[in-house]
Design a protein with these regions (language model features):
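Residue in the alpha/beta-hydrolase core beta-strand immediately N-terminal to the catalytic nucleophile
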Residues: 68, 144-146
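An N-terminal-biased, well-structured beta-alpha scaffold segment characteristic
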Residues: 1-90
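Phosphate-binding beta-alpha-beta segment of Rossmann-like dinucleotide-binding domains, i.e.
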Residues: 85, 93-144
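Glycine-rich Rossmann-fold phosphate-binding loop(s) that bind the pyrophosphate
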Residues: 150-151
């Protein structure tokens, strides 16, 4: 079996890059723009998607076999055009669920403690200005927090 022609819209983790290079001719877009993707993805059989894919890529690439979203959503892939062309569309749902959950907790704490304002004042006006915020931050103790999830 001949090597696959694999194109990625972005640089990926070194271990992933090594694995993909081991199974095919692996190329990366010079920029994650529609123009660069359209110009540089020629001949790709598999495209790893982290930037919007122009529908023209699907229309042009007769040998395109798969568009694989490096993430949970499919919003960057013109799914209808891919389906019509017989191109497999895949993603990795739930892959970042823990990271998103941690980010929600961090953001809630940052807002409770007024982190954005404190950080700005510390950087722009020094310790005394940042210290003044200590009277306005709230404690998490004895509070109820509700988190509503949408998805995995």
């Amino acid at each position: 079996m001949a090597d696959l022609s694999i194109f990625s819209t972005h640089h990926l983790h070194p271990e992933v890059t090594e694995a993909l290079s081991g199974i095919g001719d692996y190329r990366v877009a010079s920029a994650p723009t529609p123009e660069a993707i359209l110009a540089e993805s020629s001949g790709a059989e598999v495209i790893v998607v982290r930037a919007p894919i122009p529908v023209e890529v699907i229309e042009r690439e007769q040998g395109l076999k798969a568009l694989v979203r490096h993430g949970a959503g499919l919003d960057m892939i013109p799914v209808d055009a891919a389906t019509q062309a017989g191109v497999l569309v895949a993603n990795v749902p739930g892959v970042n669920a823990l990271t998103v959950a941690e980010h929600v907790i961090w953001t809630a704490l940052a807002l409770l403690k007024r982190y954005p304002e404190v950080n700005t004042d510390l950087r722009e006006r020094g310790w005394a200005a940042g210290r003044a915020h200590s009277d306005f931050g709230r404690e998490l103790s004895r509070r109820t927090i509700g988190i509503v999830g949408m998805g995995n």
